[in-house]
Amino acid sequence: DLHLLHRIQNAGCRSREDVVFALQKIVDTIVQESCGITLIGGDVSSNFSLFDLFVKLLAHSAYGSQTFLFVLGNHEFWEFPDLSVEHITDKYRKLLEEHGMYLLQNDLFYKNEFDDMGIIPYAELEQMTNAELTERLRCSRLVVFGGTGFSGCNVEFNANNGIYWNTVDRETEIQESKKFDNLYQKLLPVLDQKNTVIFTHTPQKDWSSNPKSHAKFVYVSGHTHRNVFYDDGEERIYADNQIGY
C-alpha cells in the first residue's frame, strides 16, 4: 500500500520534476532495504501513468539485481471502468514484464535450487493435476501463490462501498474471490510440502470462506491500513508494511 498519490500530495509536489524526485526517494528506500525477492502488494497508485513511472524508476535503480513480485490492489482498477478484470490485469502485466518484473493474479511464482524462477499461470494451474504440479515444483525452494484476492467474503467493506470505484461490481468481486479461494484450496496439498507464501492485497478473511491460516504458510497482505504482524510459529501473518498513509 504505497499510495503514491498521497505521498506526492504530502510532499507538496508542484511539477513533474518534483514528482520524479519524490518517487525516486521512495524507490531508493525500497532498493536499499530489499534483497533477493521484494513483494509489492497493490495500491501503488490509482493513476496508471504514475504506476508506470514508479516501475521505470524502480527498474532503473535496481539494475536487475532484485526480483519484484506485484499483485494489484483495488486502487489499480479505478482508472479503467470500461475494462474487465482480465484486460486490466493484462495491461499491468505487460508493463511489468517489459521491466523484468512479475505480476501475480491467481498465479504461482517459483524459485528453484538452481535460482531458476518463473510463473505458472492460472489457466495452467487450473488444468494441472496435483501430481503434475508436485513434479513441476520438485526442485523449488520457494513458491508464492498470489493475486488481488478481492473482498468477496467481506460483507461490510466491499465493491458496494466503491473500493474499485466503478470498475468491479459486487457480483464480479465475489466471483474473483471464489476463483482465488478455489485454486488455493486445490493447491493446499502440494504447497504444504514447500516454503510457501500466500501473497494477496486483501487479507485472507476477505477472500476465503474458511479463513484458517495454514501452519506452514506465510500470509502477506495489505489493504486494511492497519499494520499487523503475528508469528507464533504456527500462524504467520505479515501485514505490517502498509506505508502509504
Residue ranges: model-predicted function:
Residues 1-70, 76-82, 192-193:
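N-terminal active-site segment of His-dependent metallophosphoesterases
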Residues 6, 120-197:
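Active-site-proximal loop/helix segment associated with metal-binding centers of metalloenzymes
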Residues 15-22, 49-53, 84-88, 172-186:
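Soluble or luminal CAZymes and related metallo-dependent hydrolases
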Residues 25-31, 55-62, 93-94, 98-141, ...:
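Short amphipathic alpha-helices and their capping/turn segments at secondary-structure boundaries
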Residues 37-41, 69, 144, 197-199, ...:
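Structural motif
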